[in-house]
Amino acid sequence: MIVNFTARHTELTEDIRDYCEKRLKRMGKILDEVQQIEVILTEEKSRKRAELLVKRAGEDFALSEETTDMFNSLNKVFDSLERKIVKERRK
């Protein structure tokens, strides 16, 4: 799986990169069909947005969360990703 990071109007720190990689590694088994994930971090005034663009065979989708803290946004968007993939596997 390829993971790309993009930061818009904010700095991509090692802490943020490490956090993302740890969360993705923890979800390893459920992400086996995923080919590429793009993590996009955006900061506008006090709003911090985390977006995931997920590409897998036959389907691409995007998830986004916005809070006042980047780690909260990341946590919520990774939780959304996990719920979405688990839900689709149950079908």
Q: Which role does the model predict for each range below?
A:
Residues M1-K91:
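N-terminal, polar/charged subdomain of small-to-medium soluble alpha/beta proteins
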